[in-house]
């Protein structure tokens, strides 16, 4: 395996990891938003 090939593989891996982190962050954010929404709905229901 040539050095150039190796660097290409490493770049691909880094891009892949960044992509995964990006998706993880998005899903974590949506989860947090959903939790907050549920919390607000529950509080509103309690007040009624």
From Swiss-Prot:
Source organism, top-level taxon: Viruses
Annotated protein name in UniProt: Putative protein P'
Organism this protein belongs to: Bovine ephemeral fever virus (strain BB7721)
